[in-house]
Amino acid sequence: ASYKVKLITPDGPIEFNCPDDVYILDRAEEEGHDLPYSCRAGACSSCAGKIVDGSVDQSDNSFLDDDQIGGGFVLTCVAYPKSNVTIETHKEEALVG
């Protein structure tokens, strides 16, 4: 399956379709969008975003705790879309600040 992903960035929203077996960050880059990242392994907060609507599978994440995930935070480098999803990007400061 493939889902519509909408990323709300400081430069404005971007939308693309993302298969459910491709990480959202990887697909965004394939579409030509620059997003923040560091480790690409779900072990830091550089790529953090916040889910506005929809759901993801980020079971490869090792950084976020259950409370942060419950609060809507997502690591885009290890997030597969599980529905049409809207995510606010560039949320590292909100997460760790």
Swiss-Prot record:
* Gene3D superfamilies from the UniProt entry: 3.10.20.30
The record's keywords, sorted A to Z, are:
2Fe-2S, Chloroplast, Electron transport, Iron, Iron-sulfur, Metal-binding, Plastid, Transport
Q: Which GO terms describe its biological process?
A: electron transport chain; ferredoxin metabolic process
Which cofactors are required for activity? [2Fe-2S] cluster
* KW Transmembrane (keyword) present: no
Enumerate the residues binding [2Fe-2S] cluster: C39, C44, C47, C77
Give the highest taxon in the source lineage.
Answer: Eukaryota
The record, for PROSITE patterns, names:
2FE2S_FER_1, 2FE2S_FER_2
Q: What would be an example GO MF term here?
A: electron transfer activity
* Cellular compartment(s): Plastid, Chloroplast
**Keyword Metal-binding belongs to the record:** yes
An example GO CC term for this entry is:
chloroplast stroma
Domain 2Fe-2S ferredoxin-type, by residue range, is: 3-93
Q: Relay the cofactor remark from the entry.
A: Binds 1 [2Fe-2S] cluster.
Q: Which family does it belong to?
A: Belongs to the 2Fe2S plant-type ferredoxin family.
NCBIfam families the UniProt entry points to: fdx_plant (TIGR02008)
Task: Provide the function of this protein.
Answer: Ferredoxins are iron-sulfur proteins that transfer electrons in a wide variety of metabolic reactions.
Q: What is this protein called?
A: Ferredoxin
**Organism whose genome encodes this protein:** Solanum lasiocarpum
